[in-house]
């Protein structure tokens, strides 16, 4: 039996959706093929890589991609992670379930380097917690 497809989307496929893809592969990988993309492709943020490494998830081989309409149309579940992606996400066929899990963009955090780093860790943990809830409840 083929796996279901989950597609995580955000603006630049740099931080939030990359972290979601990493968590998704770790937590949902038995039942789901996990992908991520952005409205634009900004490249992997080094702090996203570092934050995920702290929880033993390696995302260095993931790529920053724009939305692939083939994956979008084959997906079972599409999750937008920011308002921009929610507003600009292309139409999907009726069978594709869509949901919005909003998280702040850690790349836009203000303050000292330490404060900015803390935001990356917090967003990483919130995304991981949300995916764990999804794994248990399907919602």
Swiss-Prot record:
One of its GO terms (biological process) is response to arsenic-containing substance. The keyword Disulfide bond applies. It holds the Pfam family LMWPc. It is an enzyme of class 1 (oxidoreductase). It comes from the Bacteria. SMART domains: LMWPc. GO terms for cellular component: cytoplasm. Its EC number is 1.20.4.4. Keywords: Arsenical resistance, Cytoplasm, Disulfide bond, Oxidoreductase, Redox-active center. Its main location: cytoplasm. It is found in: Cytoplasm. Disulfide bonds join 10-82, 82-89. The active site is at residues 10, 82, 89. GO terms for molecular function: arsenate reductase (thioredoxin) activity; protein tyrosine phosphatase activity. Catalyzes the reduction of arsenate [As(V)] to arsenite [As(III)]. This is Arsenate reductase. It comes from Oceanobacillus iheyensis (strain DSM 14371 / CIP 107618 / JCM 11309 / KCTC 3954 / HTE831).
């Amino acid at each position: 039996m083929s796996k279901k497809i989950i597609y995580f989307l955000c603006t630049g496929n740099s931080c939030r959706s990359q972290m979601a893809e990493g968590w998704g592969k770790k937590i949902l990988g038995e039942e789901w093929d996990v992908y991520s993309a952005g409205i634009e492709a900004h490249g992997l943020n080094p702090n996203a890589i570092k934050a995920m490494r702290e929880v033993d998830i390696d995302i260095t081989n993931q790529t920053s991609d724009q939305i692939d309409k083939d994956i979008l149309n084959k997906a079972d579940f599409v999750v937008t992670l920011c308002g921009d992606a929610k507003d600009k996400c292309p139409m999907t066929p009726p069978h594709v379930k869509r949901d919005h899990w909003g998280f702040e963009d850690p790349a836009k955090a203000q303050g000292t380097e330490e404060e900015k780093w803390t935001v990356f860790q917090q967003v990483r943990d919130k995304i991981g917690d949300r995916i764990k809830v999804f794994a248990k409840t399907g919602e």
